Amino acid sequence: MSQVILDLQLACEDNSGLPEESQFQTWLNAVIPQFQEESEVTIRVVDTAESHCLNLTYRGKDKPTNVLSFPFEVPPGMEMSLLGDLIICRQVVEKEAQEQGKPLEAHWAHMVVHGSLHLLGYDHIEDDEAEEMEAIETEIMLALGYEDPYIAEKE
């Protein structure tokens, strides 16, 4: 199985207590090599201000969000392994984990898995797309040793 090249950027005012680079690498490797051979992904961990600004600029949503995915569009005729960028907001991930009663590490893993699937072209706008994407996320999370991230919604 091929490995994903990770460019990890920690852009928080306080970077203590964040997952280790090896964890981010493990989470990426659980997703992307299943779908494509060589890949490069940037993960940028940010504070709420940067997440808010990017979410407003690119999605028209006036609030920070947990993860933003920016797939790289390779020009026709060029071969590049760059898959795209994930922007993950530390404070939103921490708040959601607490509100949802999930272990923080599991929620970080879920955000990487979820965002990676977006980079690979998956979406959850339509119900059938959401079901397919959530099924893949659940399978990957279970393989990583975490609980189904959607268990509360299914009960």
Curated annotation (Swiss-Prot):
GO biological process, one term: rRNA processing
UniProt entry tagged with the keyword NAD: no
Compartment list: Cytoplasm
Stored SUPFAM superfamilies: Metalloproteases ('zincins'), catalytic domain
GO MF term set: metalloendopeptidase activity; RNA endonuclease activity; zinc ion binding
Binding site for Zn(2+): H114, H118, H124
A family per Pfam: YbeY
Keywords: Cytoplasm, Endonuclease, Hydrolase, Metal-binding, Nuclease, Ribosome biogenesis, rRNA processing, Zinc
Keyword Hydrolase on entry: yes
The enzyme's E.C. designation: 3.1.-.-
Protein name as annotated: Endoribonuclease YbeY
